[in-house]
Amino acid sequence: MRNTATGKTMNPFTPNPELDLVLVRESAIPPELVYQAYTTPELLEQWFCPRPYKAIEWEIELTPGGAFNSVIVSPEGQRFPGAGCILQAVENKTLIFTNAVTAGFRPAINEGEDAFSFTAIIQLEPSGTGSRYTATVMHADAASKQKHETMGFFDGWNAAFDQLIEVMTV
């Protein structure tokens, strides 16, 4: 993207270390398969949450304003519905989704002690025979970032990505 006023190239995904969490992974899985794992409900159910949690009942519409909804189920059977919105989907390259708004860009109500809004930017690039996966998760304030990190962002997202690799390698 180029700034028309200055002519300089802009990167709209520059992380802010005070607000954002960034996970970078290299894998033997090509970008096409990682993208497929992120956009196919039957595959998401197999890897999206660190076991023994599950993510079920996926509704995904790969268009700006489309739904990115699921239900997280705890080992005890407690259900946590999650409604989100696709902001951008560029096949095999980028998936951006948020829980700050729901399908149709309707403002979301994120209630509860552990609730916070975030926007996730998933970027995929070819790397060797596989891919480089970069997940940038942006938060509105430092407290939300800290809450997400404290609840296990790095362990959870790493475990989930390991599960993605397992599912897509079979």
Regions found by a protein language model. Give the residues of each.
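Hydrophobic ligand-binding cavity/cleft-lining segments
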Residues: 1-55
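Intrinsic-disorder/low-complexity, polar/charged segments enriched in Ser/Thr/Lys/Arg/Asp/Glu/Gln
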Residues: 18-24, 31, 67, 81, ...
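Short beta-edge strand/loop motif at the mouth of beta-sheet-based domains
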Residues: 22-23, 42-81, 92
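Hydrophobic/aromatic beta-strand elements that line small-molecule binding cavities or substrate pockets
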Residues: 25, 57-60, 82-88, 117-126
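A short, structured loop/turn motif at beta-sheet edges
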Residues: 31-32, 61-63, 87-95, 123-132
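Hydrophobic pocket/interface hotspot
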Residues: 34-35, 44, 68, 86, ...
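Short beta-strand segments that buttress and anchor functional surface loops
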Residues: 68-74, 98-100, 109-110
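Beta-strand/loop substructures that line and gate deep hydrophobic ligand-binding cavities in soluble
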Residues: 106-155
